[in-house]
Structures are given as C-alpha cells and as structure tokens.
C-alpha cells in the first residue's frame, strides 16, 4: 500500500425517513450543508460547492471564534445512489482522505452508508463521532417541514 493509500477506514450507517433524492440533494446544496454540516459544538457552518465531478467544495465549521475549514473535490456524483469526494482538513493533516456515501432505498426511507478512507489513526474516533452527529442533524433537518409550527 503506498503512502497515499495508507490510513484507516471507518463506516457510519444511518436510516433517514426521507426519500433518497431529497437526502442526496442535501449533500450538494450549500444552504442545506450550512444547516446540518456542524458536528458537536459547532454553532454555524458555511459552504461553497461546485456540484460536478471535478468540482470543488469548501465548508467552514464555526465554533465560537474558531473556524475549521474542510475542502475537497467531487470524484463521483451519481444521483441519487452515490457520492464520493476528497476530504481535506487540519484534522487529516491536510492530506486528502476520501469519503464515499451510498444512498440505499429502504422501506423506512434512505439508508446512508458513509465510508471514510485514508484517515490518520488518531482521527478515526473523532471523525466517527462527527459523522454520526452530522447524520443525526441531517435527519432532523430532512424530516422538518419549514411550513409547520
């Protein structure tokens, strides 16, 4: 295995009671990303996306005065089945890690299977917690109806 391919892999799964098309779209919409792509104590997030293969994205997660920038490039966009992108941040030692997400149709909605590869071993637990929290927030947002009280 080359140094570029080295690292750890984690898998996070969650069923969200919303159709695949809607869940998939949430991953490519900057306004939507800014609402749920904020794990743990993050209070806000901003996102810029160019949703095409080879397009880039930038997400800045905000926790008080601190800013955590994440960036990457879309490698695969197959609506509503699969999304794959590089994920680069300070937490990954500014190395390109790879996130692949499968959107599986289930009776209860959509099962997300997120596989994050090439992670530094020291970051597996924190990324597992972060992705789990992000999926919970995505589920809450996806299930909400802005018109309801």
Where are these regions (language model features)?
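A short, structured loop/turn motif at beta-sheet edges
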Residues: 20-21, 75-81, 102-111
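Hydrophobic pocket/interface hotspot
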Residues: 23, 33, 57, 74, ...
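Hydrophobic/aromatic beta-strand elements that line small-molecule binding cavities or substrate pockets
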Residues: 14, 47, 70-76, 87, ...
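A conserved amphipathic terminal alpha-helix motif
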Residues: 5, 117-149
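Short, solvent-exposed aromatic-acidic interface loops
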Residues: 88-93, 115-122
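Hydrophobic ligand-binding cavity/cleft-lining segments
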Residues: 1-43
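Short, solvent-exposed secondary-structure boundary/capping segments
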Residues: 81-88
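Short beta-edge strand/loop motif at the mouth of beta-sheet-based domains
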Residues: 11-12, 31-67, 149
